[in-house]
Every structure is written in C-alpha cells, then in structure tokens.
C-alpha cells in the first residue's frame, strides 16, 4: 500500500473562514475534504455543539483527514462520495439543512506530487487522473480508445488549447505503435506536436492537455454545475456557499450559476412586474472573485490561480 503525503497549505484560508461566516454550534459541510486543511480550521470555530460533514471521493484523502481531525471526532462526520451528491450525502448523515458549505475545486497538492495518480506532467507515472480510484475509466482509456475528433474536442474545449487538433493527430499516430499509458509518454507527444516557438509561451506545453484530460475523466464541469444547485438546496436561509476554483472554465460555471439563482426571473423585460413567480435563491456576496494577496502568493504559488466566490441563501423555498 502506498502512503500519500496530504500535508498542504489550504488556499485562501482566512478569506474562506470569513465568507463562511462561521457560527458556534452551526452545521457545515466541506464537500471537498482533501487533507482537511480547511476543515481543521472550520471545526475549531464551530465547537462546542457544531457539526462538520466532510466529503471526498479519494479514499486516501479520507484516511488522512480522519487522522487530522481525530481530536474533533465527536463533531465530525466523514463520508466517501462525490460532491455532486452533496444533498443526498448530507441527508443520509442526518443533516437536512446546513449553515454553510465549502467547495474547493481542483487537484490537491498531494495528487499533483504523487506520480502514481498521473495528474502531473512533472512526474512520470501511470496515465490515470481518477479522483475516485474506484472508477474503471481513466485518462489512458480516453487516449487509446477515443477517436481523433473526440480527443480534439476534449483538449480544445476543456483545456482551451489552440493546438488541440495537432496534439490529437500525434496521439492517434503514436498509439499505432503501442498503448499510451504513462504521463511522460504523453508529455513527449505533446512537445513534438506543438511547434518549438509555441512551446516557449505560457508555461509548460502539457499543462492545458493534462487539465483537459483530468476534467474529462472526472466529468468535472457537469459535476460542478450539479453540485452548486444541490448545495444551494440544503442551505438554511442566511447560509453561505463558498466555492474556490482554479481555472476559468470552473469560475465561469460558478459565476453563471450564482447569477442565475440571484436573478432567476424569466419574464420579458417590457413587463412592469414579475409574473413568472421565480424567486431568488441566492444573494451574491462577492461581486468580483476574491484572489490571494501578495503574502499568500509568496508562501504558496498554487494560490495564484485560485478564485473564491461566495453567495448567501435568501429564500426558504425548497425544490
């Protein structure tokens, strides 16, 4: 059994705690528990009497979080699952409504640093990228079984990679001589596909393709859309939803979802009053995303791309 190091610095920690508006004795959910960096600080502020539900689909993360939160075990519930199912998991855990929810989207430090998970283009390892290792389908399955058109679509749409078609073409050609099953083999293909001049622009040439594959393997964008809606449904009026994203695709989904639930009216603009009956569910707290300050950027380079958005439940109407 491989032991992973889950010690990491939680991003935007003080901003997260502030926007959750934590209350002693309150009920809260960390839908992306990870190594419990955020959760360890949340639970300190809600005891005595408070309850924290932590959810993660990574069993190694759950094991690490249990150890980290051992001192608060009477106030913590830990569940294995995908945060898209946050409503059902909360209700199964005895939490019908909660005072706040945190979703910290993206790959955690330990997943990037451990080559056995296949998330990183900086370490050689199996081309996996599954957040939940119970799933049968991984990144190598996509590359070795999908059509050139489908691979192009994934890399273009999820990675926003302008060389997507060329990379896909090289992948199809390479797999004729053998299965593409390691991260460094994919990195080599990407480097050969992207012209030399373009490889010197915008960081590591494999960054966008690896992001695209990770999103596709874990169905991340659809999961996020469902999670925002399901999380909102179990918030008490006045409860806070805080979401941290790490790339523009995720941030746009959160921004759009928040705006749609703040202004759900579908009446024609020429009508003097609303007749559709759709009530706002949320009030957006952060008109612009909160980003890391200079001090955090120096201490934790992975906070550079982090964006935090927060909203408050305003309606008691349930679906």
Task: List each language-model region with its residue ranges.
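S-adenosyl-L-methionine-dependent methyltransferase catalytic core, i.e., the SAM/SAH-binding region
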Residues: 1-319
């Amino acid at each position: 059994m491989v032991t992973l190091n889950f010690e990491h610095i939680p991003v935007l920690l003080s901003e997260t705690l502030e926007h959750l508006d934590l209350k002693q004795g309150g009920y809260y959910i960390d839908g992306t528990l990870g190594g419990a960096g955020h959760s360890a600080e949340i639970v300190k502020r809600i005891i005595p009497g408070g309850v924290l539900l932590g959810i993660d689909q990574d069993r190694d993360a759950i094991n690490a979080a249990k150890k980290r939160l051992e001192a608060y075990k009477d106030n913590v519930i830990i569940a294995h699952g995908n945060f898209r199912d946050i409503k059902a998991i909360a209700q199964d855990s005895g939490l019908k409504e909660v005072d706040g929810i945190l979703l910290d989207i993206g790959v955690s430090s330990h997943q990037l640093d451990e080559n056995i998970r296949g998330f990183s283009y900086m370490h050689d390892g199996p081309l996996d990228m599954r957040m939940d290792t119970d799933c049968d389908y991984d990144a190598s399955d996509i590359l070795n079984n999908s059509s050139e058109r489908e691979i192009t679509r994934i890399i273009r749409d999820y990675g926003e990679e302008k060389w997507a078609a060329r990379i896909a073409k090289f992948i199809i050609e390479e797999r004729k001589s053998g299965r593409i099953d390691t991260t460094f083999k994919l990195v080599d293909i990407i480097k050969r596909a992207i012209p030399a001049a373009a490889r010197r622009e915008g960081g590591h040439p494999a960054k966008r393709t690896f992001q695209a594959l990770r999103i596709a393997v874990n169905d991340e964008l659809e999961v996020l859309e469902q999670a925002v809606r399901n999380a909102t449904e179990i918030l008490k009026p006045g409860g806070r939803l805080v979401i941290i994203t790490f790339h523009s695709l995720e941030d746009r989904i959160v921004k759009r979802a928040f705006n749609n639930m703040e202004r759900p009216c579908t009446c024609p603009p020429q009508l003097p009053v609303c007749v559709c009956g759709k009530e706002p569910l949320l009030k957006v707290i952060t008109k612009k995303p909160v980003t890391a300050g200079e001090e955090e950027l120096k201490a934790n380079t992975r906070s550079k791309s982090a964006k935090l958005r927060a909203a408050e439940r305003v309606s008691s109407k349930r679906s």
